[in-house]
UniProtKB/Swiss-Prot annotation:
Pathway per the UniProt entry: Cofactor biosynthesis; thiamine diphosphate biosynthesis
Organism: Rhizobium meliloti (strain 1021)
Gene3D superfamilies named among the record's database cross-references: 6.10.250.620, Radical SAM ThiC family, central domain (3.20.20.540)
Subunit structure, as described in the record: Homodimer.
GO biological process: thiamine biosynthetic process; thiamine diphosphate biosynthetic process
Keywords, sorted A to Z: 4Fe-4S, Iron, Iron-sulfur, Lyase, Metal-binding, Plasmid, S-adenosyl-L-methionine, Thiamine biosynthesis, Zinc
Binding residue positions for [4Fe-4S] cluster: C559, C562, C567
Disulfide bonds: none
Reactions catalysed according to its record: 5-amino-1-(5-phospho-beta-D-ribosyl)imidazole + S-adenosyl-L-methionine = 4-amino-2-methyl-5-(phosphooxymethyl)pyrimidine + CO + 5'-deoxyadenosine + formate + L-methionine + 3 H(+)
Cofactor dependence: [4Fe-4S] cluster
Protein name per its UniProtKB record: Phosphomethylpyrimidine synthase
Domain of life of the organism encoding this protein: Bacteria
Binding positions for substrate per the UniProt entry: N217, M246, Y275, H311, S331, R332, G333, D372, G373, L374, R375, E411, Y438
Ligand binding (Zn(2+)): H415, H479
Length: 611
């Protein structure tokens, strides 16, 4: 480990627990040294209920009074796990070059991260991927960590749980065991994105037989943003529930900004290496080469990028299929490779060198996210020949990657109307061997710029129910501009709703716990518990307090929507109390004879005087 000259003042980020919450840790059994983080939400003492345990991806940032120093990075919790396997070696790594940061100099150059760690790679002939270990029958600490995390702290039930949902062929177990995690990874149905050079990340899994995950995109552009802003966006996104973060930076300082993000990220980080490679050739797509791209892959793998989006499915003879589209090729990576292919009139270097890319990924355990460069950018283009031709190629590439012990997920659309969404899921499962699907939405209509987090949230909930393993968020700024901090939160919350709705619909055994707890709090007028159990406690509280701001209103048996006389839940309480007093049968007879709820026909038809 080498130290670089520290910053005069390191940037600060959002810290502190969410309301009524505390971080708790569950130990491992196979690997007793692991500590799996979760969030406990305390309920009001009058509820008589235990705290509600929820999945937590926020890392140390939500620990009470945590000592966080961005210029030091997070604890390297997986380092010992990686080294104990005995199949890696440390080395000096490549030197940082001027082109790595877009030739930025002087005050325009983002400072280097103060700590340099020697990168690790596989020893010759070894594959250090979670897939290789799973196939060898090894239950890694990462796998046990994930099993505990997916169970949300639950113990195995003695009897089968009652299930309510339609899983469309998914096999979500009542209780996730480390062995189940191993089997799913070995079969290619799930991935654990965990680069050996990103030991700060807490292990998580992406697969349709697990909780639906969400990704948040961040990154600078040639126009705006800085290192401090991007690190804060990452912390902010994970605070609200992002399971992974993609750094899609396209401007200067890509290398240095990414280093700051990775060293401080408790979740896997993904990238599109093509973006940085393009910066290295001054933005001229035709000047891209395998040599430049290969160097970029190694650079990012050494830093600790956990998954690469690789647009290797854009083949030369597919490009003419996009000519008659309404919106052509909308993927940045797809359009870059299409331009390169047409200029050189040959298959892309990503396709021709795919096995070489696999060799790099298996040496660092970088997972593939096979990019959908020909995804539809409008509902008019959904499910067309170009889209599905590329998908079939991605299925072929998946088999090549699996043969090299590389982990793979498949990226999906895009813009798809509701009635065409399930066809996407069914076809992906069929042609890609059930590799995890990772979709951008899809957006279900094109008429709502400024509200595309909603148009896409609809599609995301549907395709998550049908089997998509991870949903890439869309913010209100989609198609309009670079999202800021508030947009990131809106996008994450929207997609947490979609993912959770999908888990409920699939019948995930732990999904309803939080819903039921909030519903009971709502019925019992426990306002503080309602706020604290929600995905966004601050917004829930603020909306309530806009009209009923006094502390006395936090125990009131009504809200400003109905007021005290028309609150349906208050009336339900009265009905329940009277029913318990007189007996249900007597109450039913009373109402049939013309009680408060049912009136005889002649009375109900009689108009009051004066009308």
């Amino acid at each position: 480990m080498n130290l670089v000259k520290p910053l005069a003042a390191a940037p600060s980020v959002t810290q502190g627990p969410l309301p009524a919450s505390r971080k708790v840790y569950k130990p491992g059994d196979i690997h007793p040294d692991i500590r799996v983080p979760m969030r406990e939400i305390a309920l009001h003492p009058t509820s008589g209920e235990p705290p509600v345990t929820v999945y937590d991806s926020s890392g140390p940032y939500t620990i009470e009074n945590a000592d966080i120093r961005i210029d030091a990075g997070l604890p390297r919790l997986r380092s010992d796990w990686v080294l104990k396997r005995g199949d890696v070696e440390s080395y000096d790594g490549r030197a940082v070059k001027a082109e790595d940061n877009g030739f930025a100099t002087g005050e325009r150059l983002t400072p280097e991260f103060p700590v340099r760690n020697r990168p690790l790679r596989a020893k010759p002939g070894k594959a250090v991927t979670q897939l290789a270990y799973a196939r060898a029958g090894i239950v890694t600490p990462e796998m046990e960590f994930i099993a505990i995390r997916e169970n949300l702290g639950r113990k195995a039930a003695k009897e089968a749980l009652a299930r309510d949902g339609e899983s469309f062929g998914a096999s979500v177990p009542d209780f996730v065991t480390p062995e189940f995690v191993r089997q799913e990874v070995a079969a290619g149905r799930a991935i654990i994105p965990a680069n050996i050079n990103h030991p700060e990340a807490e292990p998580m899994i992406i697969g349709r037989n697990f909780l639906v995950k969400i990704n948040a995109n961040i990154g600078n552009s040639a126009v705006t943003s800085s290192m401090a802003e991007e690190v804060e966006k990452m912390v902010w996104a994970t605070r609200w529930g992002a399971d992974t973060v993609m750094d899609l930076s396209t401007g200067r300082n890509i290398h240095n900004i990414r280093e700051w993000i990775i060293r401080n990220s408790p979740v896997p980080i993904g990238t599109v290496p093509l973006y940085q490679a393009l910066e290295k050739v001054n933005g001229i797509a035709e000047d891209l080469s395998w040599e430049v791209f290969r160097d970029t892959l190694i650079e990012q793998a050494e830093q600790g990028v956990d998954y690469f989006t690789i647009h290797a499915g854009v083949r030369l003879h597919y490009i003419p299929l996009t000519v008659d589209r309404v919106t052509g090729i909308v993927s940045r990576g797809g359009s870059i490779m299409a331009k390169w292919c047409l200029h050189h009139h040959r298959e892309s270097f990503l396709y021709e060198h795919f096995e070489d890319i696999c060799d790099i990924c298996r040496a660092y355990d970088v997972s593939f996210s096979l990019g959908d460069g020909l995804r539809p950018g409008s509902i008019a283009d959904a499910n067309d020949r170009a889209q599905f031709a590329e998908l079939e190629t991605l299925g072929e590439l998946t088999k090549i990657a699996w043969a090299k012990d590389c982990q793979v997920m498949i990226e999906g659309p895009g813009h798809v109307p509701m009635h065409k969404i399930k066809e996407n899921m069914d076809k992906q499962l069929a042609v890609c061997g059930e590799a995890p699907f990772y979709t951008l939405g899809p957006l279900t209509t094109d008429i709502a710029p400024g509200y595309d987090h909603i148009t896409s949230g609809i599609g995301a909930a549907m395709i998550g129910w049908f089997g998509t393993a991870m949903l890439c968020y869309v913010t209100p700024k989609e198609h309009l501009g670079l999202p800021d901090r508030n947009d990131v939160k809106t996008g994450v919350i929207t997609y947490k709703i979609a993912a959770h709705a999908a888990d409920l619909a699939k019948g995930h055994p732990a999904a309803r716990t939080r819903d039921d707890a909030l519903s009971r709090a709502r019925f019992e007028f426990r306002w503080e518990d309602q706020f604290n159990l929600s995905l966004d406690p601050e917004t829930a509280r603020n909306f309530h307090d806009e009209t009923l701001p006094k502390e006395a209103h936090k125990v009131a048996h009504f809200c400003s929507m109905c007021g005290p006389k028309f609150c349906s839940m208050r009336i339900s309480h009265d009905i329940r109390a009277e029913a318990q007093k007189e007996g249900l049968e007597a109450m039913a007879a009373k109402y049939r004879d013309g009680g408060d709820l049912y009136m005889p026909l002649d009375q109900s038809n009689a108009a009051p005087a004066g009308e």
